[in-house]
């Protein structure tokens, strides 16, 4: 009965625990493939119904992105001229001075390109002086090397950063397209910004020029603390649910499981005590034998262990005997040249036994002769 109760209890605990552990292991979603399928389905639904009002979960984020795998939230709008409102848990991060905190455009040294670039993030860096040559949609530009009065656009700014890398989604990028004409006369200049999380940086952002391809595509790296992910409400809810689930399992194990088995055990022992009071011969087995009675497998392994111990002890005894025989104990030898083989030893012991029998017979004869002398004296008298 106790074994059956224990099996029922363990099966109930496993049925409750396994789904929660699977949920914790897979994170906010069921799997990476399910998250990607859900994201693609969401994109198709948005393209199919562009006029349909979007819910709070499906709204387009301005210069921000939510990681579909971890549920974390990254807001790059703090680097633009129109930042979003801070969410719960976000802190206002400013530079060392007011100018740095209000900075919305950056001048980047073009190493090896003999010019400087001016960039904006999710906004246009074009001011009044540049508005005559460039559109207010321009996200990045530079001064022409041949004509300093000529400004060249390398892409219109975008407000939709993207996470690339498949199921891992580790790279955060932002593309600027539809710039000035490339030297080939067919394509237009474009820019790719790669964002890197940097919590040690002192300024809002640090932009570095990486290189270009055919003077048509330009690559930059943006290091900023605003590129670091923050917690999301959904993620916090998931963590709270996991905590509640663990507490529920602990409650079931502690109060429902352990105490139920303890009550069953006490009831069983009380019944055994009653039977013992009625007839002591019916309950000769101690209570701890009922509890510690193992399964067949445990008995099998215990038997193997005992057999191994016996074999080891016998082997050690044989080794000790062999060592004593090699070291040479106290032996009786008939002559110095006696052999140490077993056959010689047997012959030696046989000779010794024969000698002992002869000595015993001599002692018996001597006793008989001594007893005969008084009778002869009496006869003479």
Swiss-Prot record:
Pfam families, per this entry?
PRKCSH_1 (PF13015)
Which sites does the entry annotate for glycosylation?
A: 116, 136, 178, 215
Q: Which residues cross the membrane?
A: 237-257
Q: Looking at the keywords, is Zinc-finger present?
A: no
Membrane topology is: Single-pass type I membrane protein
Task: From the Swiss-Prot or TrEMBL record, state where the protein is found.
Answer: Golgi apparatus, trans-Golgi network membrane; Endosome membrane
**Gene Ontology biological-process entries:** protein transport; vacuolar transport
**Molecular function (Gene Ontology), one example:** signal sequence binding
All residue ranges annotated as the MRH domain in the record: 61-230
What PROSITE patterns does the database record attribute to this sequence? MRH
Give residues where Phosphoserine occurs: 335, 339, 342, 371, 380
**Where does the record locate the signal sequence feature?**
1-23
Start and end residues of each stretch annotated as Disordered: 33-57, 81-104, 360-381
- Main location per the UniProt record: Golgi
**Cystine bridges: which residues?**
63-122, 182-216, 197-228
Q: Which GO terms describe its cellular component?
A: cytoplasm; endosome membrane; Golgi apparatus; late endosome
Q: Which residues point to the Cytoplasmic side? A: 258-381
Stretches in topological domain Lumenal: 24-236
UniProt key word DNA repair = no
* Keywords, ordered alphabetically: Disulfide bond, Endosome, Glycoprotein, Golgi apparatus, Membrane, Phosphoprotein, Protein transport, Signal, Transmembrane, Transmembrane helix, Transport
Q: Which family is annotated?
A: Belongs to the MRL1/IGF2R family.
What is this protein's function per UniProt?
Sorting receptor involved in the transport of vacuolar enzymes from the Golgi complex to the vacuole. Involved in the delivery and maturation of PEP4 (vacuolar proteinase A) and PRB1 (vacuolar proteinase B).
Q: What name does UniProt use for this protein?
A: Mannose 6-phosphate receptor-like protein 1
């Amino acid at each position: 009965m106790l074994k059956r109760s224990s099996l029922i209890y363990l099966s109930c605990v496993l049925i409750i625990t396994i789904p929660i552990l699977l949920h914790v292991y897979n994170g906010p979603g069921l799997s990476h493939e399910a998250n990607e399928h859900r994201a693609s389905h969401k994109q198709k639904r948005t393209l199919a119904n562009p006029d349909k009002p979007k819910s709070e979960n499906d709204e387009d984020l301005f210069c921000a992105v939510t990681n579909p795998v971890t549920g974390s939230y990254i807001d790059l709008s703090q680097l633009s001229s129109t930042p979003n409102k801070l969410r719960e848990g976000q802190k206002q991060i400013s530079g060392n001075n007011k100018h740095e905190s209000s900075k919305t455009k950056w001048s980047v040294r073009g190493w090896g390109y003999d010019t400087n670039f001016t960039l904006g993030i999710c906004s246009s860096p074009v001011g009044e002086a540049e508005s005559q040559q460039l559109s207010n949609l321009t996200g990045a530009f530079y001064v022409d090397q041949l004509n300093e009065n000529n400004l060249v656009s390398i892409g219109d700014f975008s407000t939709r950063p993207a996470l690339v890398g498949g199921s891992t989604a580790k790279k955060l990028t932002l593309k600027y397209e539809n710039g000035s004409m490339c030297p080939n006369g067919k394509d237009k200049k474009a820019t790719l910004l790669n964002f890197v999380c940097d919590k040690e940086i002192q300024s809002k952002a640090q932009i570095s020029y990486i290189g270009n391809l055919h003077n048509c595509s330009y690559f930059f790296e943006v290091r900023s603390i605003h590129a670091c992910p923050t917690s999301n409400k959904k993620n916090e809810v998931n963590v709270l649910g996991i905590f509640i689930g663990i507490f529920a399992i602990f409650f079931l194990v502690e109060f429902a499981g352990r105490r139920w088995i303890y009550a069953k055990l006490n009831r069983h022992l009380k019944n055994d005590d009653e039977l013992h009071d009625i007839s002591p011969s019916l309950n000769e087995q101690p209570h701890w034998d009922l509890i510690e009675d193992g399964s067949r497998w445990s008995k099998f392994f215990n038997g193997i262990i005992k057999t191994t111990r016996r074999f080891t002890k016998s082997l050690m005894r044989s080794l000790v005997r062999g060592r004593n025989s090699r070291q040479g104990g106290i032996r009786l030898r008939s002559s110095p040249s006696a052999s140490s083989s077993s056959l010689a030893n047997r012959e030696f012991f046989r000779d010794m036994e024969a000698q002992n029998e002869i000595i015993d017979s001599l002692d018996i004869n001597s006793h008989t002769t001594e007893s005969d002398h008084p009778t002869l004296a009496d006869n003479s008298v």
